[in-house]
């Protein structure tokens, strides 16, 4: 086995801990990182971030709205959607994890997912 060989084309990064504004699903490739921040309450707006990691390893310049990165963000969104579909199929039924299928769906408007956030919060507090 080659320890320097690539193992995954993409990896999902998931944060479902802490304040709901910090909950996010991200996808990372060798060169790019895409994050969808779904929270849109308390003055926040749902937003996307895209970083070109090989050129910007500290993630200082968000390329999500840069027209030169339109193809890259579309590709990263496809990867994101595949990881979300996997989460939807495989999420455990406790602690509100299944509700994140709605929370992280970038095509669902906040008005239709705010209840899912409340559902997640109430289920995670019932331990």
Task: Show which residues each predicted segment covers.
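Active-site-proximal flexible loops/turns
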Residues: 38, 59, 63
């Amino acid at each position: 086995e080659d320890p320097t060989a690539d193992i995954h084309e993409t990896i999902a990064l998931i944060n479902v801990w802490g304040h709901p504004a910090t909950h996010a699903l991200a996808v990372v490739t060798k060169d790019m990182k895409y994050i969808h921040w779904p929270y849109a309450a308390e003055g926040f707006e749902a937003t996307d971030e895209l970083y070109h990691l090989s050129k910007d390893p500290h993630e200082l310049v968000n390329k999500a709205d840069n027209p030169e990165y339109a193809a890259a963000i579309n590709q990263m969104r496809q990867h994101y959607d595949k990881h979300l579909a996997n989460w939807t199929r495989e999420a455990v039924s406790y602690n509100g994890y299944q509700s994140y299928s709605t929370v992280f769906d970038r095509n669902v408007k906040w008005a239709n997912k705010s209840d899912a956030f409340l559902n997640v919060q109430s289920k995670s507090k019932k331990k």
